[in-house]
Amino acid sequence: MAVLELHRAGLTGRLQPLDLRINDGEATVLLGRSGAGKTSLIGLCNGSLLADQGQVLWQGQPLRRCRGALRRQIGTLWQDLRLVEELTVLQNINSGALGRHSLLWGLRNLINPPDQSIGRQVMARVGLPPSFLHQPVSTLSGGERQRVALARLLRQQPALVLADEPLSALDPRLAEDVLNLLLAQHGCLISLHRPDLMHRFQRVLGLRQGALVLDAAPSAITTEALAWLYSDD
């Protein structure tokens, strides 16, 4: 069953109109050169960018009209992480659950963060020590911040995970940990610069100069097709 559908959706100058169905529980990798449109496609899929042609449907409804619980079912791990540096690890993790709670709960998170036990649980899942709970994010290393962003995503409990270059600048061990956690989610669309990892996924999408030019199982993608996808021609 398709949970996310793009019908001739596009962004002038960035993405040519495309048709795409992301199915429930499916692990999909998005490949292509820098500037091919991968980040723009992720933005269309989570609603942070609005298609100027066609439409995007989430659970059968226009994504731009989705609110509340339905919209919160899409979680995104951005390449720039989008953490609040001045807040603690727990406060940043709890922000993943803001949509499920009241404004009062959100204000409390800024003053006396609740749900510390839940925070510790998701921190353990991403390999962060409990001692980091009340530590400002600004004091953490790049790899530690990546884990905080992933913990925030897990706290959100999304039905579909979108990730924009989540493995860039990570050492091999951390990259493997992050990829395993993302693939363990119910369904995902992950943008990567690592075609060597495509066999970890069920489906491969390829973007070239803003056009969707590949959509197949990893076993069907040839060396020649990958070379063309990343070529200058």
Briefly describe each language-model feature range:
Residues 46:
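Helix-to-loop junction immediately C-terminal to a conserved catalytic motif
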Residues 61-80, 112, 221:
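ABC ATPase NBD coupling module
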Residues 161-165:
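Catalytic Walker B motif of ABC-type/P-loop ATPase nucleotide-binding domains
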Residues 106-131:
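Conserved ABC ATPase "signature" region
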